[in-house]
Amino acid sequence: QLITLAKGASFVGHADSFAMIRGGHIDLCVLGAFEVAENGDLANWATSENDTAPAVGGAMDLAAGAKQVWVLMEHTTKDGRPKLVERCGYPLTGLACVRRIYTNLGVIDVLPEKGFVVRDLAPGVTLDELRAKSGATLHTN
């Protein structure tokens, strides 16, 4: 099946995309993460399975250059460890840059003065369950 462009679609080259990012022209970016700290620090370095050095790719540019950073991730690791933490244990990609987190259990805002604030819960998830699976304090409004 052929793929066609929608009306108004455009292409942007690699160099131009980084110029937009580094120039502060991106209003919102969505990234994955290994961990997010309650102050909004982001850790999402890719680790390699073939003995090459870990790499951050363009995420560091996005974390620094976008006006808002949202994160999409599972709430815990495969072995049940929390990904929402007081302080990141992995190398940081961006400092205090995350403003919202979407997980399979809920939506959490990151506010500078409060830390993690629960915005919404996934269907069937309780606040107690969300708190039990988090590694930092979750506040409510």
Stretches found by the model and what they are:
Residues 1-140:
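Conserved phosphate- and dinucleotide-binding cores of soluble alpha/beta proteins
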